[in-house]
Amino acid sequence: MTETREPTETGGYASLEEDDEDLSPEPDSEEEEEEEEEETTDDPEYDPGYKVKQRIGGGRGGPSRRAPRATQPAGPPAQPCQLCGRSALGEAPPGTPPCRLCCPATATQEAPGPESRALGEEEEEPSRTGETRPAGRDGDEDEEEGGTYHCTECEDSFDNLGELHGHFMLHARGEV
């Protein structure tokens, strides 16, 4: 589109834009607001599609929020078991067995004792304790059944809830 310029009173040509807007020394507040809106579209609060972009790989493309398990720093030293108060493996005084809930690896090496039974089993077992049944046989029966408790992270089977709890805590610390 061609426009003809008309000579102004001073003999020069008139600007194509209006003089009132261009000659003002102060910038328009409308232009600043538009610029601010453009800057805030990357902010998740202002961009409704931000989460969708993150899921499909668009957006900022930053690293995953989850840290890899291998790079997690080691936590504070092991605390005593919150259930029984015993020290964890390595911190137990000599001659004292460590807590089975804090250290399930130790629990699998030791023979099953009354501590490792579930609450319901303790009430039923006292009548059987006098019978001549080998202690190792109880564990063999559970292995054939595949255990009663299963880890949701790795599908391992455990005989009692305490062992499952200890195993799951190892997952939480990133040790398994």
From Swiss-Prot:
Q: Where are the zinc fingers (C2H2-type)?
A: 149-171
Biased composition (Acidic residues) is annotated at 16-46
Q: Which residues carry this modification: Phosphothreonine?
A: T96
Kindly indicate whether the keyword Zinc-finger belongs to this entry. Answer: yes
- GO MF annotations for this entry? zinc ion binding
Q: Segment Disordered: which positions?
A: 1-152
**Keyword Zinc-finger among record annotations:** yes
Which superkingdom does the taxonomy of this entry point to? Eukaryota
Give the InterPro entries listed for this entry: ZNF428, Znf_C2H2_type
Keywords from the UniProt entry: Metal-binding, Phosphoprotein, Zinc, Zinc-finger
Q: What PANTHER family does this protein map onto? A: ZINC FINGER PROTEIN 428
**The name this protein goes by in its record:** Zinc finger protein 428
Q: What is the lineage of its organism?
A: Eukaryota, Metazoa, Chordata, Craniata, Vertebrata
